[in-house]
């Protein structure tokens, strides 16, 4: 019995092999290559609405699985004089074995080898891109138009289940190219090495696209998943996840989208850039502002985009080693983007922004004002700690406004140089020059730190309150100081003058008409109050009043300095001075000390630093001194 069973099964197995072999042999005779050619042409034409041209008859391969190979395939517009949408070296289609035995042709997967796609006109918007499909006379265009009719009746809860479920399957593109026109420059560009897999089982189901190519010199990956692709193409809403990545940067959006004239993107966006300059040069060349900004950026936020308006909440981003949180809005007025919002940094280094606002021309960096006419800004910045060159700031609160070519930088508060500072600076382009007007005030500023920051050996220990007003019109940084006009008032309640002793100065003035006054680190003078009033104009500084009061003396100085830059004052100082005793009177004294002090005549003299080392002066009494 066992032997009979084995013989029976062996016979069945041999029969199956025989029938399979016979089927393979007769299969090419059952399937007409013309049938494959016609069916493929019908399918492509029905879906795209384009005419399909096949240069050669298809070839049928049965091993390792049935497939048809067509060479020289062209998708051409039905309008004369329009470039073909696609020209492919070959198209391979996987065939269903069951349908082949029935004498029918059905495709499970289509591979397009070495195609070149041509988009003759620039696509201005995503809606414009998909609108081209909806206008086609193929099955895809018909399905999109039917979905649009459903959306018109019930835009919030469209029911597309009853639509005819058009099979689409899988399309694979191998080593293709795409030629298109850049929407900004109008120049034709080419994407090469295009490999893509497009999965869309049926028109009412989810779409999955995976693609990679070389775009603008970089290997780039694109990924798109849409849960309701047909609704999306028809202008409805769909859940979508899309990402674009390369070594130059990447962006991912996850959320709900509607691609129409009144588009909407509502979800989460994540962006990374190894260097903002690298990302901009890759995406848009050097035609956008900020292309010199080299800091790496990582960004995440909720993202809501509508026509002419973008809102980003719950912003968290990293810029170099700086982290920030906040909210931003972007809208457009007369095609000019306007950014509004606030950002809170954990620390901020203003040197990051130097390449953005400053250009270098013949080793003379200056402010770039072109951006003022191309963007509007109203942003509040805050940071518990910030850095400006080698100056540290804490509790920073800043407002920046740019509108109609006019920039306002408002420093609401900052702890700086041991005290606090407020300032307001307005910048307005004037042809090739820059009009700058500013006001600043400070409280309890440590003058010793100020001098150290300026690179000057400290000759003063005190805290000062100050107010400053300045105005200038210039086309370079050196021109700002050369043409600057304004006033500066300093008020110090107490402190110490380092390197000099007024008692020693009085004794030397009493004995000599002229002498050399040197800075001596062992000497100092404590003062009770020191008020200074200065003005500057056309590269010169005028000290209108400088009154220092010590316990015993009052020292007044005035004069003009041929420089508006404090670091250059050393060899340009020529000041007049008067030294006199305190508690004196020219009329009536009420005590003996006042009487004694009044009998001492004030000493008037000049201080000249020309040709001297820093801190040294040539002192000469006035000829008419009493």
Feature-to-residue mapping (PLM):
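N-terminal type II signal-anchor transmembrane helix
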Residues: 1-49
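Extended terminal
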Residues: 1-14, 305, 310, 315-319, ...
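Short extracytoplasmic
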Residues: 45-72
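Elongated, acidic membrane-bridging lipid-handling scaffolds
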Residues: 136-265, 366-402
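Transmembrane beta-strand segments that form the barrel wall of outer-membrane beta-barrel proteins
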Residues: 237-242, 309-316, 382-384, 406-412, ...
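Amphipathic hydrophobic-ligand
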Residues: 50-51, 79-95, 184-197, 216-225, ...
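Secondary-structure transition motifs
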Residues: 50-51, 72-198, 284, 330-334, ...
């Amino acid at each position: 019995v066992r032997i009979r069973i084995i013989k029976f099964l062996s016979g069945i197995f041999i029969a199956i092999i025989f029938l399979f072999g016979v089927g393979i042999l007769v299969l090419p005779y059952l399937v007409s290559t013309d049938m494959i050619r016609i069916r493929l042409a019908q399918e492509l034409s029905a879906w795209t609405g384009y005419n399909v041209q096949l240069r050669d008859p298809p070839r049928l391969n049965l091993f390792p699985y049935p497939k048809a190979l067509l060479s020289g395939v062209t998708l051409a517009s039905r309008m004369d004089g329009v470039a073909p949408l696609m020209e492919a070296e070959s198209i391979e289609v996987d065939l269903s074995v069951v349908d082949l035995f029935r004498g029918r042709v059905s495709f499970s997967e289509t591979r397009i080898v070495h195609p070149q796609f041509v988009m003759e006109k620039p696509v201005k918007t995503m809606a414009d891109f998909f609108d081209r499909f909806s206008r086609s006379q193929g099955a895809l265009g018909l399905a999109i138009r039917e979905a649009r009719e459903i959306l018109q009746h019930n835009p919030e809860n469209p029911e597309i289940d009853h639509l005819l479920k058009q099979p689409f399957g899988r399309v694979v593109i191998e080593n293709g190219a795409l030629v298109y026109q850049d929407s900004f420059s109008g120049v034709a560009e080419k994407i090469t090495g295009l490999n893509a897999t497009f999965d869309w089982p049926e028109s009412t189901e989810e779409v999955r696209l995976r693609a990679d190519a070389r775009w603008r010199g970089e290997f780039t990956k694109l990924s798109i998943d849409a849960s309701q692709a047909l609704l999306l193409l028809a202008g409805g809403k769909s859940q979508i996840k899309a990402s674009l990545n390369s070594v130059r940067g990447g962006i991912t959006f996850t959320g709900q989208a509607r691609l129409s004239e009144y588009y909407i993107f509502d979800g989460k966006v994540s962006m990374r850039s190894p260097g903002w300059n690298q990302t901009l040069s890759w995406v848009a060349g050097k035609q956008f502002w900020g292309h010199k900004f080299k800091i790496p950026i990582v960004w995440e936020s909720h993202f809501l985009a509508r026509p002419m308006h973008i809102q980003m909440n719950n912003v968290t981003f990293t810029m170099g080693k700086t982290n920030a949180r906040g909210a931003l809005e972007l809208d457009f007025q007369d095609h000019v983007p306007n950014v509004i919002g606030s950002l809170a940094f954990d620390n901020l280094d203003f040197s990051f922004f130097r390449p953005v606002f400053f250009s270098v021309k013949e080793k003379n960096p200056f402010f770039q004002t072109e951006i003022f006419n191309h963007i509007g800004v109203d942003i509040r910045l805050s940071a518990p700690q910030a850095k400006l060159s080698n100056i540290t700031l804490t509790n920073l609160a800043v407002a920046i406004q740019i509108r109609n070519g006019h920039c306002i930088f408002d420093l609401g508060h900052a702890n700086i140089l041991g005290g606090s500072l407020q300032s307001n600076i307005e910048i307005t382009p004037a042809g090739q020059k820059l009009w700058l007007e500013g006001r600043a005030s400070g409280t309890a500023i440590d003058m010793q730190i100020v001098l150290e920051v300026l690179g000057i050996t400290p000759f003063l220990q005190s805290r000062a309150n100050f107010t400053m007003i300045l105005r200038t019109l210039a086309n370079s940084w050196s021109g700002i100081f050369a043409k600057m006009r304004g006033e500066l008032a300093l008020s110090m309640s107490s402190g110490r003058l380092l390197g000099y002793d007024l008692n020693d100065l009085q004794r030397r003035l009493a004995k000599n008409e002229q002498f050399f006054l040197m800075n001596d680190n062992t000497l100092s003078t404590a003062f009770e109050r020191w008020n200074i009033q200065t003005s500057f104009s056309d590269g010169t500084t005028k000290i209108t009043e400088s009154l220092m009061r010590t316990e015993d003396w009052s020292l007044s100085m005035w004069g003009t300095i041929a420089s508006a830059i404090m670091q250059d004052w050393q060899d340009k100082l020529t000041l007049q001075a008067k030294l006199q005793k305190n508690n004196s009177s020219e009329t009536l004294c009420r005590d003996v000390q006042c009487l004694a002090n009044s009998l001492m005549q004030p000493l008037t003299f000049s201080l000249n630093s020309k040709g001297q080392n820093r801190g040294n002066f040539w002192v000469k009494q006035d000829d008419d001194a009493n």
